[in-house]
């Protein structure tokens, strides 16, 4: 194996380029059932030096972290200690890639790598100071953007479905509720049908295992077409179905559930469930 990898390296190393076009080709090369490449980059200033962080990923089906069929590669020229680099990634993955679910199915194959070469020549980030915080914020932007690209490009998807839980008693409660909603097949099908089916959302919250009072829940739908309240204190309000359908017809839709128990929040990302998801996976042969 090592000899084979060495041969591949010798053949491919001369082809390496530091151009945007080469990066895009790399993002395309790792695609499987993805319909589009997924990449993003950002620059920040650290110690008077410009630091670049860039990332690419692939994933479309069997997406339900912790383990899922996804690959993520993030690189930076920042000078940062190995310990803090690992800690920054480990913490950020919890709120980004691990909050994505396309179909609720896991896999034994997933990787997220964060590599730093120090070529920005900034003063080494070796403590949790302002520079470290700035780096973590940029890393979160990269990982959040890539996570949403995975969710929005789920197999057969026509819409990105975001779920925000607010007013939770704890972070754990918010995470559990948001992931239960975003994974619900009935809710995902309703999103595809542009149907403000609040009953399916409350149902998913109910079987999540998290404790909450359904009679206190407020529920909203939001997209670039507007925002509408569907439930107040667990009871449907007199909303316009036409307006709700308009809001739910966009290619990115957010459900916001306020459980009124505290100040904690969580956001999960998924997609609608379509006929094409069935077709893609019914036609697949191993």
Briefly describe each language-model feature range.
Residues 112-114, 158-170, 198-208:
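A short beta-alpha structural unit
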Residues 175-176, 183, 187-286:
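Internal helix-turn-beta structural module
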Residues 20-27, 41, 97-109, 145-162, ...:
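Flexible, glycine/charged-enriched surface loops at secondary-structure junctions
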Residues 3, 54-56, 71-76, 112-117, ...:
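Short glycine-rich or small-residue beta-strand-to-loop segments that form or flank ligand, phosphate
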Residues 61-121:
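Mobile "lid/hinge" segments at catalytic clefts and subdomain interfaces of large enzymes
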Residues 118-193:
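A glycine- and small/hydrophobic-rich beta-loop-beta segment
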Residues 1-9:
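Single conserved hydrophobic/aromatic residue that forms the stacking wall/gate
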Residues 12-46:
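Contiguous domain-boundary segments centered on the initiation and propagation of an alpha-helix
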